């Protein structure tokens, strides 16, 4: 399992479309080239603290089954980081999301 922090409104819009295409705050899969993810809950909390502290809209944590994605997932170390993060190189099918949990930071 891997995790992705999402605006609840972005996830709600993805459900009827059948797939989620938001990479990170304000950027789409097409703009970024991949969807940012976290390898575990601790990593997701770190991402929230660094990047989502100013966000006032409701957030959800998506739990994603990599085997259901149908696209590559690569562990990569972003520039300026000291740990690897899973990057999802395609849209996330709604069926690949096994849990959606409200997230507060």
Where are these regions (language model features)?
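Conserved, structured core segments of small domains
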Residues: 1-105
